[in-house]
């Protein structure tokens, strides 16, 4: 009897481990300034690159905190919709977690979604996450002409990093799958009982078998940063715990400049003399100096900045 109980317990543990699967981890560990299509993402609609690599975000106790860089969604061409694939899921739930900083939002539009297989004929962008000009987060199952997105009343802080979790649940039957959205300002290892927003499919779009995540830009004045994307079949795997680094993560570039950020500071490592220019989002030059090779620290307020060197231009986030 004891052996039978042990075997049953081991079988249950094995099944539980098999059911809890990490499908995708994207920490944007690429060179700053690189377009996503050079980093394993696919854009099939021939849009102009509007999403590139910037320095990353931090959210205490989250597994993606402070690893690699981040993706800056900033551009007017909404046909540039980089996709990244994961293993097709046909049952259960898919959880997508990511860090978000909505620094500038000038137009209501969706910036993130799921979809099924990539196709140039079907546009099944499902589980669309929106931001509007009031800095409120919203959700729709499918396109707004079928059903307007639903927005939460909370106004997000442009200088705060949030953890967003999208849950897609596949339910037996046609056009009845459900999406749930969670917005966290502090880490929790347990799935909240009540989501922030929840929608059941009542649109013209068929339910999908998710196998891609999609980023989307819609306005050149928007500055939205996404980082630390985790796709999994359980909350515990998608919203896994981690430790933020005690120092900033170095961001190598394609010239002789390496940088990292810490709260309200930019740190540079130069291998040759370099003229450094920093501009805020209004275009005002807030720092200009020719610096010798070596290490340099520049104090800055929170916000987005354009870092210009003699060879390249980088968009950076100071938290």
Which residues does each predicted region cover?
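Short, aromatic/His-centered strand-loop micro-motif at the edge of beta-sheets
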Residues: 140-162
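Secretory/extracellular carbohydrate-interaction modules
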Residues: 65-136
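Extracellular carbohydrate-recognition regions
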Residues: 19-47, 244
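Extracellular glycan-recognition surfaces and repeat-rich motifs
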Residues: 34-70
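Carbohydrate-binding surfaces in secreted/extracellular proteins
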Residues: 28, 98, 159-199, 229
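Residue-level detector of functionally pivotal "anchor" positions at catalytic/ligand-binding pockets or at interdomain
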Residues: 237-265, 274
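Flexible glycan-contacting loops in extracellular carbohydrate-active proteins
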Residues: 191-225
């Amino acid at each position: 009897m004891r052996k039978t109980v042990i075997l049953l317990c081991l079988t249950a543990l094995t099944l539980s481990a098999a059911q809890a699967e990490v499908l995708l981890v994207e920490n944007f560990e690429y060179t700053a300034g690189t377009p996503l299509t050079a980093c394993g993402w696919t854009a099939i609609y021939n849009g102009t690159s509007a999403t590139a690599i910037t320095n990353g975000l931090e959210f205490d106790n989250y597994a993606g905190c402070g690893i690699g860089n981040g993706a800056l969604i900033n551009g007017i061409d909404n046909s540039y919709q980089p996709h990244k694939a994961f293993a097709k899921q046909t049952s259960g739930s898919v959880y997508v977690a990511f860090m978000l900083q909505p620094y500038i939002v000038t137009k209501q539009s969706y910036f993130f979604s799921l979809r099924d297989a990539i196709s140039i004929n079907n546009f099944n962008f499902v589980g669309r996450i929106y931001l509007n000009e009031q800095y409120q987060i919203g959700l729709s199952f499918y396109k707004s002409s079928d059903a307007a997105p639903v927005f939460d009343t909370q106004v997000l802080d442009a200088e705060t990093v949030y953890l967003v979790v999208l849950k897609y649940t596949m339910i037996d039957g046609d056009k009845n799958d459900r999406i749930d959205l969670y917005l966290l300002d502090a880490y929790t290892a347990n799935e909240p009982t009540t989501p922030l927003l929840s929608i059941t499919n009542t649109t013209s779009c068929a339910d999908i078998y998710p196998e891609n995540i999609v980023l989307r830009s819609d306005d050149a004045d928007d500055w939205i940063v996404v980082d630390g994307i985790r796709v999994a079949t359980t909350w515990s795997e998608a919203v896994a715990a981690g430790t933020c680094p005690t120092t900033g993560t170095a961001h190598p570039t394609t010239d002789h400049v390496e940088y990292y950020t810490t709260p309200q500071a930019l740190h540079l490592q130069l291998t040759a003399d370099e003229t450094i220019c920093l501009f805020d989002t209004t275009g005002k030059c807030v720092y200009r100096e020719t610096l010798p090779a070596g290490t340099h620290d520049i104090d800055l307020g929170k916000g987005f900045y354009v870092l210009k060197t003699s060879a390249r231009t980088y968009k950076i986030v100071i938290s």
